[in-house]
Amino acid sequence: MKIILLGAPGAGKGTQAQFITNKFGIPQISTGDMLRAAIKAGSELGQKAKILMDMGQLVPDDLIISLVKERVAQEDCEKGFLLDGFPRTIPQADALKSVGISIDYVLEFDVPDEVIVERMSGRRVHPASGRTYHIVYNPPKVEDKDDITGEDLILRADDKPETVLDRLKIYHNTTKLLVDYYQAEAAQGNTKYFRLDGTQKVEEVSQELDKILS
């Protein structure tokens, strides 16, 4: 069971990725984690990536693809894997295909931009503990104060409406093209494509995923 999740930041991919990995016993593979692990292990690919990152350069697709290929060949990926944050572009998706990594399910979480802005800009964080609240869905007992310590909660820079809108713009300009790409792949029988309504309750989305993947 090899899965890719698509959807804008704040569409609920992280929550459902956890559900899928726990339910089906497959690892979630994040390119960021993979890069850090390869650098820590001092592998040849890791050393190459470190040189580029130390110079402030982006790690090229061919190196990332080599890392993905190496990672999915490991024992814990025998039953499958869930790719997190990759591919982001059509050349990356093509490269995955060219090295023989096939994808069984592409799952898109569809949430309107205004809902995402409301979701993300309503988040409040207690910096010391990482506890997270939401002014609408999970408010603290006292406005803008942490329930346990009474300390101030903050709105992270990443969650400010203008930042969220910028990130959504990037998503629509780049990653959204993958939606068309994988729908075309599904039409040719190369994968299965499902679009889920990400505005539903978390449990409802999880139930839908369970039906699709079981």
UniProtKB/Swiss-Prot annotation:
ATP binds at residues 10-15, 123, 132-133, 200. One of its GO terms (molecular function) is adenylate kinase activity. One of its GO terms (cellular component) is cytoplasm. Its EC number is 2.7.4.3. Residues 122-159 are annotated as: LID. Keywords: ATP-binding, Cytoplasm, Kinase, Nucleotide biosynthesis, Nucleotide-binding, Transferase. The keyword Zinc-finger does not apply. Pathway: Purine metabolism; AMP biosynthesis via salvage pathway; AMP from ADP: step 1/1. NCBIfam families: adk, PRK00279.1-1, PRK00279.1-2, PRK00279.1-3. Monomer. HAMAP family: Adenylate_kinase_Adk. This is Adenylate kinase. The lineage of its organism: Bacteria, Pseudomonadati, Pseudomonadota, Gammaproteobacteria, Pasteurellales.
